[in-house]
Every structure is written in structure tokens, then in C-alpha cells.
Amino acid sequence: MTTAALGLALRAAGHNFKIAIVHFMKIWDYGEVKTLKRLGIDLFRYGTTELIDPENPSPVDFEQAKLAMEKAEELVREGAYDIVILDEITVAIGFNLISLQGVVDLLENKPDNLELILTGRTCPEALIERADLVSRIDEIKHPYQKGLQARKGIEF
């Protein structure tokens, strides 16, 4: 998930790694965005301020996901980064905004010296099979379950 990927980015930034993050479906002004910019981590953010209807994504949702995927392919191809994080990309696959095969191709053609990190709530088996490391963070209990709103500095 995003939290673990950002922890890795923080650690790598401490060792002067060059890091890029492509946010699929995330353009809100989260607190971590401000910190990442201060650390010199390059952010490429795509999406809208509207929630996506997984059953009926809008044409804008498809266009934004396409642009995010094109940026991901460019970053991997150019090889200028040590780490590229594709945040919420597996959710974009699950919503059928981008093709699973396109992400598989990206994994199979990445340079050996690039750490390519994918995040999202679900992960297709085809990606798990090709990954070197797979982690799962399961929500057991959350304040949302009590109807509490997201809190500045905690959830965003």
C-alpha cells in the first residue's frame, strides 16, 4: 500500500536515491505530497477530484489513467531514476482503466537496476508471479467504521 511505499521512498531519499512517484487517481493535496516535494522526490499526479465509480468510470478517468501509464512507461524507459513507485496502479487495473498486460510488459521490460514498486488494494496473480517482493497490509480496524471523518495529518 501507499504507506509502505512512502516509507521505502523516505529511506531511499536518505541515501540520495533518485525517486519518482506516479499517482494513479490521486490529485488531492495530501500531507505527504508536501513532504515528498521537500525531499526532492518527483511527483506525477493524475486523476480528478471526483471519486471513481468502479462500475462506470468516466471518459476523464480513462484519459487520466492513460496519461499516468504513459508517464510510468516513460520513466521506466528513460532509466533516470533508482526507484519508480506506481501508486494505486493495481486499483486502476481493477477498475479496468488500464490493461493488466501493459503493466506486465512494464515489469518484464524494466531495467535490472530499477526498483519498480506497485501499490493498490488488490494485486492480480500475474503481477504477484513476476514480483520479487509482495506485501499485504490488511485493515483490521479503522475509525471510518465508527463514522469518523478523515483527519488532517493522520489519514491525509
Where are these regions (language model features)?
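Conserved P-loop
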Residues: M1-R77
